Amino acid sequence: MSLTLLPAVDVRDGKAVRLRQGESGSETDYGSPLDAARTWVDAGAQWIHLVDLDAAFGTGDNRAQLREIVRQLGDKVNIEMSGGVRDDASLDAALDAGAARVNIGTAALENPEWTARVIDKYGDKVAVGLDVRGHTLAARGWVKEGGGLFETMRFLDDAGCSRYVVTDVTRDGMMSGPNIDLLREVAERTDARVTASGGISKLDDLRAIKELLPLGVDSAILGKSLYAGAFTLEEALAVANA
């Protein structure tokens, strides 16, 4: 069994950036988002995790730019879109742009009825991002708290959610290793698939996540580790597919 890897391209003010712990103002600029995405596709990526940080933080959006990335690369790679998807208009815009999957942030959990409806309507084209601090959800660009993790999961499981993207926000962009215990806790409580996000800093972290494959942790998002040169995507894919 192989682990699916999703290199991340986070977009703010039209540029590819990386944040530390999801904090606005902590970004490092990595240039053109299209060039970044193309780099990962050329290196063998089958998925890209494309994030509109301005939409997530409520400071505008990069919708046109994200649409252009999908237009140019969508025939070569599956694109998961994330950031600021919290109503029909933002969800429809992402799907109409050609996203293979759309990640609904915990901000959408402020409207659970809507979340349940779109899960029912779109099935596995919708994933729910669980951004976690301890066992509490962080919402709206990680600034606010959004409720208990496991209570929220019970509701989403009942609604038929097919995938969770689980991020320990204290580790994201910190190169401090993923929270394996959290990933295991989530995977053991649901039949949904789980994507690991945040903190991956070395190839051994991917090996540790791979051990959770039998529980349903089938994929991992790679961000700062790739941009900072901790390892190459080719090296990561070799581990993921071993």
Curated annotation (Swiss-Prot):
It catalyses: 1-(5-phospho-beta-D-ribosyl)-5-[(5-phospho-beta-D-ribosylamino)methylideneamino]imidazole-4-carboxamide = 5-[(5-phospho-1-deoxy-D-ribulos-1-ylimino)methylamino]-1-(5-phospho-beta-D-ribosyl)imidazole-4-carboxamide. It comes from the Bacteria. InterPro entries: Aldolase_TIM (IPR013785), His_biosynth (IPR006062), HisA/PriA_Actinobacteria (IPR010188), Isoase_HisA-like (IPR044524), Isoase_HisA-like_bact (IPR023016), RibuloseP-bd_barrel (IPR011060). The keyword Calcium does not apply. The keyword Amino-acid biosynthesis applies. Pathway: Amino-acid biosynthesis; L-histidine biosynthesis; L-histidine from 5-phospho-alpha-D-ribose 1-diphosphate: step 4/9. The active site is at 10 (proton acceptor), 131 (proton donor). It is an enzyme of class 5 (isomerase). It is found in: Cytoplasm. Its EC number is 5.3.1.16. GO terms for molecular function: 1-(5-phosphoribosyl)-5-[(5-phosphoribosylamino)methylideneamino]imidazole-4-carboxamide isomerase activity; phosphoribosylanthranilate isomerase activity. GO terms for cellular component: cytoplasm. CDD domains: HisA. Keywords: Amino-acid biosynthesis, Cytoplasm, Histidine biosynthesis, Isomerase. Its main location: cytoplasm. GO terms for biological process: L-histidine biosynthetic process; L-tryptophan biosynthetic process. Belongs to the HisA/HisF family. This is 1-(5-phosphoribosyl)-5-[(5-phosphoribosylamino)methylideneamino] imidazole-4-carboxamide isomerase. The gene is hisA.
